[in-house]
Amino acid sequence: MSTTRSSLSIDLNADLGETTGGNPVSDDAAMVAIVSSANVACGFHAGDAHAISNTLAAAAENNVTVGAHVGYNDQAGFGRRFIDYSPAELADEVLYQIGALDALAKARGTQVRYVKPHGAMYNTIVHHEAQAKAVIEGIKAFGADLPVMLLPGAVAADYAEKAGLRVINEVFADRAYNPDGTLVSRRENGAVLHDPEVVARRVVRMAEEGTIEAIDGSTIRTTADSVCVHGDSPGAVAMAERIAAELQSNNITIGSFL
């Protein structure tokens, strides 16, 4: 989150480019008209080359910042299942995904500007030392010192900072939080929030106060550099539009963290 004397600004991001085989899971064209950053799938957890390319073109047309949404090589499980990689293998797969996406991005008039791990990888590197280090090594090997979008307090953030990479602290508009600041498992009731009004007010609170109400009603303090709105959630576009409207009504602008 950035501030001036008279206003606040917050980055809104969404996971996009996840269509495989012509079966869309999100309305990417509509989402890039709302968000300021797009986490674009790289073909490992989801997405095929043509769909990814179309999403990149739409992002470029709307001046939306592009990030590589790297994930485990598991389309069948949508990248939401833990895989016990060797560190070298994981680092290579992360580097491969960034490079492939950047090649497509440049052909569509944009480029990869940051990295956000997906799903099980994202959650694993909150606490898993070996995988956290490997993911950061893969990102660093790309050579562009790309910022890394992570859950606040993640072990991976320590490795990123040691590697000289900027850490973007991410909060989730539509996900429930445990009191310790981790995300409630999707297997639990109430893990995903669906009421646009509730979610919109929550995002304003994140931006203005830097706090989130946990699932037990307690208050969590956090740093919100970027807020994620899931593009594949039911009613994702309507929710993103409501969030944008609520931010605007509270004099909070939507803008990239870069």
Swiss-Prot record:
S-S bonds: none
GO MF entries: 5-oxoprolinase (ATP-hydrolyzing) activity; ATP binding
Gene3D superfamilies named in the record: Glycoside hydrolase/deacetylase
EC number: 3.5.2.9
Domain of life from the UniProt record: Bacteria
InterPro entries reported for this sequence: Glyco_hydro/deAcase_b/a-brl, LamB/YcsF/PxpA-like
Subunit details: Forms a complex composed of PxpA, PxpB and PxpC.
Family: Belongs to the LamB/PxpA family.
Record-given protein name: 5-oxoprolinase subunit A
